[in-house]
């Protein structure tokens, strides 16, 4: 049985047993593949495509196709997929999640299902978390696919539409979740079909699937246009909020209104709920607000906008912490990702919160933007025909993957047994005692030379610990959002002998910590000191060949330095192995067990030894907010000395319960987000389908004729309700009809001879006569294009307004819960009514536009709004700028592609 005997849950064992015969079949081709020439191996791709055309399925050809990729990987990269990697490949092909530990070679695994599914000709998207990894994997693994005759593309920030279209047309495309999502939204804003860049959503392989489909699931992708609202109110609301007094709610208090019932004599103006990160006015505060802003009733619907500004100012000042939730850099507010600790370049908080923080910090307040298009990652990725993913940590969230995405998780055995020892948590009575214990632990371990990686959950904690280590004379590196430029370098060297590294959660997804150090980074650092430019250094380890003499010479220097440092790091690694590998210290438990497991997983890769331990205090946020009565009882007892750890099974259980409680809460929040977005998603599909009909050049004439009939019928139903024609509201009806039917078209002298039905038929007939005459005057073909142009313009304008209206509805809908009404159901019902109103409004404006159109020489489609920003993830807005010497036509391109400037970014200059 081999690896299949690894200890997994019985359900997981069953899944692995089912896959075992497939793995044996793949391995049975090994010898025959080795005997093929390169050309014969490449020809297998042609053969597979032919077999698919003749009726075989992807499952039929899987064993042989995987064997082909395995052999090609060895010939091209010198790497051959292990047995456990073959298991991972099968799981991915089946549309499931492969949980593979850090260092098990997930990148190489993805080549197997990517190749197999690309044979169908429908495209495969490999999804990574940043542009660097997308480019690296395209150049690295792409060589295997290209060797086998497939085309490989990459989608990164800065490509124009033609380049994007070309890369999406490839058999396999690498890119980030943000790039794929934004391109989907932009494709549904284009006014000509030829401007679309994507070609359908067939199969996606998502790397770090938990990060993308869970951690980022609450953040919608938003494409915005510039709003025109004044920013003065943010400043006024901030000044008002700064003059108030408040208190933090006890974790057991449920709702702010309890305060006003039970603490009438208190005079605080607002309450802060740390659990939910919200702040709200009390009755006392509400009266102050009404007096300050000169309004009679803050709860009046006319004052909804003012109340919203006040709430956001309270939230900004009392729940959003500088250097934890965001940093201030160059007079800008930059968001810090709570899961990774990275700065999220280009992203802004929505709903006015970003502006409220700008007002709080005294930087320029930028006006709110208008949403042009939006989608959540949940609904974007559920549109793929097949979805799969890989990560080192997914099992704890299996229920969510199953419920939301219909994907189960299969734990893949490690190639070598995990040798890392995960020690029992050390729990202290308060934070000071905990940090003192951490420093003492680091001092003791540091004496042995064992490398230490200390994981923190915020910039604030990392800097506090750094100051303590400085006082104790311990040399160390600090990695947090303020030093994110050096992230890869610091993480890569964290495994060196005698090294101490403090890192926020950003600690290295995508960058392996190699015991003994990373010779690649050492060689590059040396070359920087020698004066080589950034663009040359970025191209050194490109997998693309180059004919540029300067770059070839630089690569030769790099190879020599790499050999030198490899020898040094190999010796260093021996010393690290002797002292037990990398020691991981967690400074507190994260809300999610998965994030804790990710930190632990930095140590013990590929069978290396290692250790991990978490230090916890009863004052940590997790324990304070979610620990419950058990933790509170211990914290208030006063029985325990500060300098000794508390070793009680009840505390360990309380930590586990707290994490489970938070994970459950967060799952509930994400499910709730999805319930709301599902309403928008259904509407989005209708609009995008109608847009596609226009873009595909469909004849919209019958649709517009139907609109004319609907508009007239609805108008007559509204104004002619009485059975007797003399009681009809003819003046109002004619005022309405004359907005599109010219005056004098209708003969009303015989009105008494009509009933409502015959009158409706008469008005429709006369309207269509006018419409057909207009078509004849303009010409049929030109008139058909005018119909498409006007319909597209009206749909886009109305849809963008509707997105904002639905967003406002959602912001206010939560209050319905106080009236015993299900907010989601209310949102669904009212959203449907608003959607129907929008559809009616689209018909009215389209009909008016068509009746009032004048003969023109040329009719041109125009976008109703232009994108100013795309937010929702790590959008790499600041492209590197090369200063100093002008780039020559034959110089290496500064983008790092390895090509000459004239053949890359300079080809259109």
Swiss-Prot record:
Binding site for Zn(2+): 893, 895, 904-905
UniProt GO cellular component terms: cell envelope Sec protein transport complex; cytosol; plasma membrane
GO biological process, one term: protein import
Enzyme class, broadest EC rank: translocase
GO molecular function: ATP binding; metal ion binding; protein-exporting ATPase activity
Superkingdom assignment: Bacteria
Matches recorded under SUPFAM superfamilies: Helical scaffold and wing domains of SecA (SSF81886), P-loop containing nucleoside triphosphate hydrolases (SSF52540), Pre-protein crosslinking domain of SecA (SSF81767)
Cofactor binding: number and manner: May bind 1 zinc ion per subunit.
Coiled coil ranges: none
UniProt cross-references to InterPro entries, sorted A to Z: Helicase_ATP-bd, P-loop_NTPase, SEC_C_motif, SecA, SecA_CS, SecA_DEAD, SecA_motor_DEAD, SecA_preprotein_X-link_dom
UniProt keyword terms in alphabetical order: ATP-binding, Cell membrane, Cytoplasm, Membrane, Metal-binding, Nucleotide-binding, Protein transport, Translocase, Translocation, Transport, Zinc
UniProt keyword annotation of Cytoplasm present: yes
Xref: PROSITE patterns: SECA, SECA_MOTOR_DEAD
Reaction equation(s) it catalyzes: ATP + H2O + cellular proteinSide 1 = ADP + phosphate + cellular proteinSide 2
Subcellular location: Cell membrane; Cytoplasm
Membrane topology: Peripheral membrane protein
SMART domains: SecA_DEAD, SecA_PP_bind
Cofactor needs: Zn(2+)
Binding site for ATP: 85, 103-107, 512
Subunit composition and interactions: Monomer and homodimer. Part of the essential Sec protein translocation apparatus which comprises SecA, SecYEG and auxiliary proteins SecDF. Other proteins may also be involved.
Main function: Part of the Sec protein translocase complex. Interacts with the SecYEG preprotein conducting channel. Has a central role in coupling the hydrolysis of ATP to the transfer of proteins into and across the cell membrane, serving as an ATP-driven molecular motor driving the stepwise translocation of polypeptide chains across the membrane.
Family the UniProt entry places it in: Belongs to the SecA family.
Entry protein name: Protein translocase subunit SecA
Source organism of this protein record: Finegoldia magna (strain ATCC 29328 / DSM 20472 / WAL 2508)
